[in-house]
Amino acid sequence: MEQNLPFVNVGFIDNAYNDRVLPLLGKIDNGHLFKWFLVLIWKIAALAFLLGGVYLTIAGIFGDTGYIKMNITNELFSGGQKAGASFGLVIGLVLSLVCAWYLYSNTKKRTDELNSQEYGDLLHFIFLTMIPRTITLAGEIAFTLIMYAGLMQIIAGLDGAAAYAPLLSYGDLFMQIPGVNMAAALVPSSVHGNYDNFVNDMSMGIMGVAAAFFVLIAYYIYREIYNYGMKLVCALIAFLPRLALPIAIRKKAE
């Protein structure tokens, strides 16, 4: 046991030093603390998708600005529109809960994969291990939300009134996240339908579903470009010592 204070042994201080301080410094030195923190961020994000999604789904139904007040009991709507909005509520409630669960499950899977990766050093872990997986996860999140928006628009077009899509509010949040914000514009703030505009409503929904796949492909291409760029950087760094030696010899000869 290492002594903490100079010239004197104090049992509980020495115990705290050896049991708390030294192990923490060891985790910092070997990088386990950095890896734990980065993985923790992903774990929190996964839980936020699940709990936040459930909260938004339940909370958005009620209140003065809730779906029921704005669509089902709205005196400006006809009986047919209210019936359609009721159908949109049931389907939207189920799909929103499924979407929240899927976002959680997807993020949890990627978090487990990140946690299983070996930690060599901080730069390698961030730039070669974490960022490519972050790009993949961002693409999958964007794909899920755009697919969700497209399906909700199709439901709204079919019922001729509205569809309950509370998770569309995630689009405003993702506008602040680098990497995801470039697809956030494809997630509308709300979806509505009208039989007078049936063809356009259905076309928008189908285009949204198709766009989800194109966005996912774009993110995977983005990841491949990033990986290729990192290979070039690593190759350049490895080549620099070989380049420096002839230059040094030439300068010495001069």
Where are these regions (language model features)?
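Hydrophobic alpha-helical membrane-embedded segments
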Residues: S86-K108
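Terminal helix-to-tail segments of small alpha-helical proteins
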Residues: T134-A165, Y220-N227, A253
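Membrane-interface segments at the starts/ends of alpha-helical transmembrane spans
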Residues: I28-V39, K69-G92, I126-T129, Y170-V215
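Extended alpha-helical segments
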Residues: E2-L5, S203, M207-E254
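Canonical alpha-helical transmembrane segments of integral membrane proteins
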Residues: V39-I61, G139-Q153
